[in-house]
Amino acid sequence: MKKNNSIKIIFSLFLLLIIGITGTTLIAQDIDTTKIKNKEFNENVVFYPQHQDDEILWGVSAITKAIEERGADNVYIVLVSDGSGVNVFTRNPIFTKIPRKEKEKLRNNEFKAALQELGVKDKNIIILADEDNKLGTHYELMEKTILKFEQELGSVTHIAHHYKYDDHIMHRKNGEVLKRLRDEHKIKDARYFMKPKYVKDIPEEKREYYKSETEEERDKAKKAINQYKTIDVNKGKLGIGYTSAHSYFDNLYKDPNYTSVLSVYWRIRRLKIFNRLWFYL
């Protein structure tokens, strides 16, 4: 009996080793591309940035392309968090006595100004903190909003943060909401913002690159980015976005095409042969 158990353990370890060695091959052979239209958005496009500035840092050119392809009436931006917990507010003493709602307003001033430069319509900007009437982040309402868009509009491309390849826990939770709904087949087209340093972790055939290539596109992108750097006290703009994430903004400024990279939805599935082998262990 002990001998049989030892054999099973050895065989299990061997099987795991084989799976690890062939992992890359399995990924390449088992990518679900049937419902993905590469670099083509569905009739309606909804972006779900977690914080004010995420839509620009990771999606400025993607938003421009979405509007060009589907029209401004069919492109929506859904802000998931109120953004009032950004490090600028906690580290700079001038903000200590400002109410949280006022901090949110300061961030939204930059957010709305940036989207206006890109041509996003005011009626298509949805701030979940306003709808939920509570502070913080709003993952449950995000899920309801995703499902509402899917059910009411039918042909929708949903874009959130990546559920794994992101160094911000709130971004990953944001992406997990979208991934779960796609895993459960409740939505058809899910894609994810990619920070530049994680692009290498995504298979090449699952990456989408969006660039601002014309003078008009580049002008729009730069003006949108500048809204997070501009200081204009009279308009309630204090350059909060740039101050809190200046290195990310500087990298984007250095890119002449203001490139946005998205990852399309994909899953790794175990091959049937491994399921059968596992059954006999």
Predicted segments with their positions:
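Active-site beta-strand->loop->alpha-helix modules in alpha/beta enzyme cores, enriched
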Residues: 23-184
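Compositionally biased, intrinsically disordered low-complexity regions
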Residues: 22-25, 241-243
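N-terminal Sec-pathway targeting helices
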Residues: 1-15
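Phenylalanine-focused residue identity feature
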Residues: 11-14, 41, 47, 76, ...
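The feature marks non-catalytic terminal segments
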Residues: 110-118, 122, 186-281
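Helix-centric, low-specificity signal for extended rod-like, repetitive segments
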Residues: 1, 100, 260-263
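Hydrophobic core
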Residues: 15-22
